[in-house]
C-alpha cells in the first residue's frame, strides 16, 4: 500500500505510483505552473477570488492546468511541497480509461490555451512537424481495441496507457 493506495493491479494505482517520483516537489518546482494540480493546494483567498476556477469547463480534465496558467499569467508564485494525497479506493480500470478519454476531449477543446502546458500536445506537435501524424494514426488504429483491452484488463501497461493517450488524441483531432 502506497499513500493509502491498495489496488496494486489497478491502472490508476500504477499511474499514481509511477507519478510519485516524476511529480515530486523538486520535479514540479522546475515547471511550477505546468505541474499545478488542484487535488491538494492552498491559496490566498483574495487571489482565488480574483482568479476563480473556470466555470466554462464542463468536462473532466485540465481545469487544474488551466488554473495554473491563469496563476502564472497573474504573476502569482507557487511553492510545491511533498504532501501526498491518500486514496482509500480507486476507480476501476474501465472507469479510469473513460476519464482519460474524456480528458483528451477536454485537452482538444482547450488545445490553444494549453499549448506549452501539456507534454501530450508537445508530442503531437513534434509528430506534426515531422509529418508523422497520419502514420501514427494508421499504426494506432488497428491496435486500439487490443490496447483498450489491455488497459481495462488485469495487468494493464503504463506504456500502453501512453500509446492510448496519443492514439486517442490523434483520433479526436481528425
Where are these regions (language model features)?
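Acidic donor-binding loop at a coil-to-helix junction in glycosyltransferase catalytic cores
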Residues: 59-67
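Conserved donor NDP-sugar-binding/catalytic core segment of glycosyltransferases
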Residues: 1-13
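Short, hinge-like loop/turn segments at secondary-structure boundaries
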Residues: 10-17, 96-99
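A recurrent flexible, glycine/aromatic-enriched loop bordering the glycosyltransferase active site
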Residues: 23-43
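Substrate-positioning beta->alpha
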Residues: 44-47, 63
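Active-site donor/metal-binding and catalytic loop motifs
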Residues: 74-112
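A generic structural signal for short hydrophobic patches within well-formed alpha-helices
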Residues: 47-49, 86
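Non-catalytic, C-terminal membrane-associated alpha-helical segments of glycosyltransferases
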Residues: 102, 121-174
Amino acid at each position: 500500500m502506497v499513500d493509502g493506495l491498495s489496488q496494486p493491479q489497478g491502472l490508476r494505482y500504477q499511474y499514481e505510483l509511477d507519478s510519485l517520483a516524476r511529480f515530486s516537489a523538486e520535479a514540479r518546482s522546475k515547471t511550477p505552473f505546468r505541474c499545478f494540480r488542484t487535488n491538494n493546494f492552498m491559496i490566498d483567498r483574495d487571489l482565488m477570488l480574483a482568479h476563480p476556477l473556470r466555470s466554462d469547463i464542463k468536462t473532466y480534465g485540465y481545469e487544474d492546468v488551466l488554473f495554473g496558467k491563469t496563476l502564472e499569467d497573474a504573476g502569482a508564485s507557487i511553492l510545491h511541497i511533498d504532501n501526498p494525497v491518500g486514496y482509500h479506493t480507486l476507480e476501476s480500470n474501465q472507469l479510469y480509461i473513460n476519464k482519460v478519454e474524456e480528458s483528451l476531449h477536454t485537452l482538444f477543446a482547450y488545445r490553444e490555451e494549453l499549448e506549452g502546458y501539456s507534454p501530450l500536445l508537445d508530442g503531437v506537435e513534434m509528430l506534426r512537424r515531422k509529418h508523422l501524424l497520419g502514420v501514427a494514426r494508421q499504426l494506432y488504429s488497428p491496435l486500439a481495441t487490443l490496447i483498450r483491452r489491455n488497459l481495462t484488463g488485469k495487468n494493464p501497461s503504463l506504456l500502453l496507457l501512453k500509446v492510448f493517450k496519443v492514439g486517442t488524441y490523434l483520433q479526436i483531432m481528425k
